[in-house]
Amino acid sequence: MNWNKTAKEDFEAILAKIPVFLRGIASTKVAQRAEILARNENRLEVCPKDVVDAFFKETPFGFHGPMKMDMDALGIEYKKYGHDK
C-alpha cells in the first residue's frame, strides 16, 4: 500500500521518539494497523490520520501521555483526529 508523504514523515518522526529496543515491533505493528485502517476506508493510500490512529491503537494506554507530548513537540495535530482526552 502507498503512503502519502506527510503520513510517512509523521510515522518516521514518531517512531524515532520510541526507545530503540521497542522500535522494531512498534514499526511493524503501527504500519500494519495504519494500512488496515486505510483499507477499511476503501483507500489505496495511508494518510496522516491513519498513522495517528494506528499509534493510539497500538500504544498501551499508559504511554499515551508521553506519546502526545512527543506528537506536540513534532507538530502532529492528533487532537483534530479525536485524541484530545
Question: Which positions does each model-derived feature cover?
Answer:
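Non-catalytic accessory segments flanking P-loop/AAA+ NTPase cores
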Residues: 1-85
